[in-house]
Amino acid sequence: MKDFLIRGMTGDGFVKITAVQTTAMVERMRQIHKTLPLATAALGRTLTAVSMMGNELKYEKGSVTLQIRGDGPLGAVTAVSDSEGNVRGYLQNPAAVLPLREDGHLNVGAGIGREGILTVIKDIGEREPFTGRIELQSGEIAEDVAAYYVLSEQIPTVCALGVLVDRDQSVKCAGGYLLQLMPGAPAGLVDLLEYRVADVGSVTARLEKGMDMRQVAEELLYGMDLQLMEEHPVAYECKCSRKKVESALVSMGREEMERMIEEEEQISVTCQFCDAVYTFGRKDLEELLRSTKK
C-alpha cells in the first residue's frame, strides 16, 4: 500500500485530524541512511510528524523543518517537509544502540535524550521564517510535538506516532496522527477524545492488524461525522540537485573557490538527506568561478 496523508474535520467543526501512513517513506529513509532500529524509529517518527506539520502550510512553496536536539546518543535529528507532506531528513548517529525498554520496545526517549530543545521552523514565503522552540518533554517525539502545539501555538493537541521495525530491520509499518481541538470546543470533548485515543491504542498495533490510517482516523472520530477535506500520496523526496550544489559553492565566495581550485584536484559534496554525491573537478570549479564575474 502506498503512503498517503488525509486531513479532515468533524461535522461540528470542533476537531481537526491529520493522519499519515508512512511505511514506504520510513523504509526509504532506512535504506538511504542505513539506520539501525533505534535510529529508524526516531527519525521515522520525526518524518511522520513533520509530514503532517508541512501539510498545514497554505504557502505552496513553503516548508517546515522539525529539529530535535537532545542529550542522547542519537544526536540531532532533522526532518523537513514541503507543503504537500513530502519529506526528507537525517540524524547524527544512525548506528546508535541502546537496550530495549522493559516492555520490549525501542527506547527512543533515551536515544533522543530527556534534556534538549525541539525547534520548528516554518518558511511561509515571508521575509523571515517563523521559529518556535520548546524544551523536550520526554524525547519520545509524539509527546514533544503535542507540547509544541500547546505551548507555542496554543492549540490543544494529541499526537501519536509509530514505527514498527521487523526482525530483518526493515520497516514493517509506520504512521501517525494529529488530533487538534478548535476554538469553542466543549470541555467534555477532551474527555471523549482521551477515551478514544486510549481505546484505539498504538498506531503500529492497528497498522499491523491490516488497518490503514484512514480507518484509524474513522475509529478515533466514530459517530462525529468525520468529513475528509484532503487525501493525497506522500513520499520521501529529496530536493537536491547539481545546480543547487553549484549555487552553494558560489555562495562560499571567490576567495574560498580560488583556494579549492589551487589545492584540490576535485571536490565531492554529499547530500545529507539522500547521500547523493556531486563531484566537481578543477575545470568545473574554474567555470563556476568565471560565471561569478558575469
Feature-to-residue mapping (PLM):
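Cys/His-clustered metal-coordination modules, chiefly Zn-binding fingers
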Residues: 198-294
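Interaction interfaces in information-processing and related assembly proteins
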Residues: 1-230
